[in-house]
């Protein structure tokens, strides 16, 4: 029987501990069992004393004492009475719960000081405190309410705090969930305040990063208990920021909490990615020693889940308990309890074995080893190492020390000059080569597959020792030998860098500039020689770069004698993108493609990548594997060799030997044949940033180059002092100059059209560079850097001096490549282009037309005057071919005509002022000389040109329009406008070139003065262009400013002007002989240009206002043609060619005038013509187009027959007539002229005679005043019709395409009719003799019209200038508004498109997830349905069997037996009963008889008595 303590003993123990600091009575009290009926009486001060004692001990942090006090109060709580009332109720009213809150806060401070360390005493103290709290909680409802209101927030805050130990948080959650489980109904309002809601939201966030599954379950359980299921649906979106997590949380049901919580937490932990701290894997089976642990018995629990908790460093899972109801039992394996673990694969299962430090007991099972079987596909190794650490892994062996082997090296040279680097300890290097050759057969098999670096160096060393081949004179494990063939010595990097042993290098680790991995492929040539193997590792790997580098710094012997005739796998070293990104656009690389290469370039049998560096094959001798050299992964400085640091070579002989400039045959052949081509492609790449490159690799069957997209930039490290060969240097420099990142082996068809530098020129630069560097490289070590710097500066100078035209044409090439060019003539074009390269023999340095200040240009400032150095005579023809853009130079003009519109439309985007412009589809884009312009579609094939060489003055046959139009292109001409200060020579001089007459050769004669040669045209073109410059300085400045070209010095202009003026009288004498060509010839004169042959004064009516503009254009063109550097055809160039109608020398002859002639001479010309052929400048409107509006108007009127009013010479209008009426009119005028007296003719009559002559075939000879009259008529006509230009321009757009066929039909009809309508009106040469006083009459008319012409010329200049400005303003505003509106719409559409694409991606991802879920659910449903059907079948079978056995067969037999036995028994019983009844009846009868007899005897005796 327990000893009953004194009722005052508890308070006395508290007093002793508080006053005397004596805790022994309190400890003794703990050892005594207190009966329930014992009452411990305490005073009212008991709570104060208890609070003082606990607070003092908490301040002292005496954990054990506090635990003893809490345990004592907990045990005696129900027996305490204060003033006759229950002690706890009284203390609750006195504020026990509030005092416990202060205890909890002080305890929390102790907890936080311990951090995450596990202190058993602190955990016991907290557990005791919570036990006492639960006792108080169960006293009454008031205690519940106070505890809930006071402790729930503090417990939630403890759970949220990540500084608190996980075990304490788990204990607090358990107690809180117990409280919430027994919460009274009226206490739910306590959990609805804002503080609790905020804490619940924080607890929801805590689930994501808590790192312990049990704690996650406790938090989820607390959240579910603190809210009702309906309210949980609303608050879930506040607790979890992601909707799908909130939706998953809402699916948790209270009745199935365990399984639903498992699904929810697996989802949450799975989506965390790198933040994931709880890894859950399904386990196949689990054993504790020899006992198997069973999965909890829950139908909805699909797998036996094992949780790896990285936050709490525990492994936890749930098993079925041993009790009857098989409750869930949690098993937790802390990291400190595990002594060792191992992971191995057994029978296609992955086994995790945990060896524990002590024997543990789970339920009723004991063991020291925990065996967990997983599926072999699960990756649990890394997670297990993170959980338990790598030191406890069974296969982990700690490295004790580090051994360093240092080896000296001899550098030997064999007979062929090859270097043999041999360790000193190796006795026979030559003999050992045989061993290496034998090893190659085995090594080649392994080199074909990419290798992965090993996880640890110990494994590598172990494998190396296993794979080692033992030979009598084998070198050490850490030594390596190598042979550098003489043929490769200067193309490979310095051999010193390749002689690496296992000794750690003190040099700085090479910078990693790799963005993605490339598989390395070893290629073996026919002779069995292996070449370089490059193994690139991902930068994202978690491996140690130093260890990898140490592992890779091993070399092996290589026989490389047969290298000359075999292709080596080029090491593709791409330069760093950022080095030149500020100067040029950088190309991005698309996925590699492997089309045929030889169809584009025939001499690419040994194509090389730019900056290729063949590295001698490095293979390990002591292990049968190959490793990537650290030299394969390094960076290149932007200066190519500017910051090379010194590295001492092992041998002075080797150091000097590597400086010699020796090139083997194969190196010279491969590099020289491909360097120009590579640089051409590089230049093309920088000029075409719009289009991405496509990579083509040669020998696709042997190579497996994997080039990643966009950011695959492997860089080149120029080795420290010896560096690489001269060829490699120049290739690097050239490729850097053109700013290419990755050079294609074979560019695509588009890129092949954009070469801007000829092969010959590039090879001449390379050769000159070689010759300059050879003596420098032969100097001593001290002069190497000087020579390198000089060669670099020379290359940079050559690059910037010769590539100005590349910069100026960069903008022009982008839209040109975009046009829809036909691919048919590509091969033919390549041949032509290569032929032009062979013609180019001179390198001339001339600045481009663009005055751009290049900060890297060492020889030119944008403000300097250009210096023109002309080469040999053949330069002008060849440089144009070499410089022209391949995408614009066409072999067939027909292909060009089909894409004129698209080409010109794209050109607009480059110009400084964008305008919508129409071009004639008959114009010629570019032709540089007579032989290069193909206008075969304008004339019939093989038509002979018949010239009129006679001096006959009365020739009346008109010239063929078609033949003339062809000569406009075939033989250029020029137009000259002389200065106005010459009194009587102020008229246009038109130099007529070769002309083609009608096909009726019998009626034509040749004129020996009508001669034109290409050789004589260039000089006169220069001279006259400068005359035009003096006459129109302001217009010329406008032209040149917009075209971004530079003027020639004034001295040169004056020289040309003087020469042109001297040659003027001779030209004037020739004019009279060409007057007979008539008005039709005058139509062609608008497109004529200056030549050294005879000229004509015949001027088309629509010529006047074109010439000045055309002359400025001609000057602009001449300036360009003088440039010795190739200049690709620019958009301004093409557009000017459309506007030039007064040029003959210029190869950019427009067909405008030719078409106008055909239309004017057509029978249908009486109707208003659609000005389809009127050209409008596509370039900047302020360029050259001072008379663009008048040009349209002029072209319209010159293409129709006219009648002139004789009332005023200043107001003459054209009225269309039919050819017949025109001929009648001319005839009447002719008759009137003959009938009238010569002196009675007034000036107005004479004017009418001159101006009423038919436009198609009137040929009149006479003095040169006729040109002035005709010009004046044109100006008056234009002045009277200033507003028709806009209508003309609108009609151009409508009839641009449809007029080409009509033009040909009109031309054919006109050819037939003009021969019939030959003008009968003519004025003989001796008209002055027939008309007396004609000289005076002529002078009066001439002076009169001269004055009127000057006045009208000024008026028209002012008008055209104002009209041009107005048109420019409107067109600029229209273009800006249209472009801005289009850009806005495009931006809006792009934003909408991107948004919709994002939505589509999200929807597709949702559909994929849904599909995956459906698939999973379907599989589960099918599996369960199969199991269900199987069980149903088993059930039916069992029932049937039971039924058959129980009812049908056995029951009948049994019942029959029972019936038989029962009947037998019944019969026996009935017989017995019958016998019994009969016996009783017999006995009763006998008794009655006896009684009767007795009574009878008694009566007888009585009677007797």
UniProtKB/Swiss-Prot annotation:
The keyword RNA-binding does not apply. Keywords: Cell cycle, Cell division, Chromosome, Coiled coil, DNA-binding, Meiosis, Nucleus, Phosphoprotein. Signal peptide: none annotated. Its main location: nucleus. GO terms for molecular function: DNA binding. The keyword Nucleus applies. InterPro entries: ARM-type_fold, SYCP2-like, SYCP2_ARLD, SYCP2_SLD. The modification Phosphothreonine is found at residues 471, 503, 613, 638, 922, 1174, 1318. Residues 1222-1234 have a biased composition (Basic and acidic residues). Major component of the axial/lateral elements of synaptonemal complexes (SCS) during meiotic prophase. Plays a role in the assembly of synaptonemal complexes. Required for normal meiotic chromosome synapsis during oocyte and spermatocyte development and for normal male and female fertility. Required for insertion of SYCP3 into synaptonemal complexes. May be involved in the organization of chromatin by temporarily binding to DNA scaffold attachment regions. Requires SYCP3, but not SYCP1, in order to be incorporated into the axial/lateral elements. This is Synaptonemal complex protein 2.
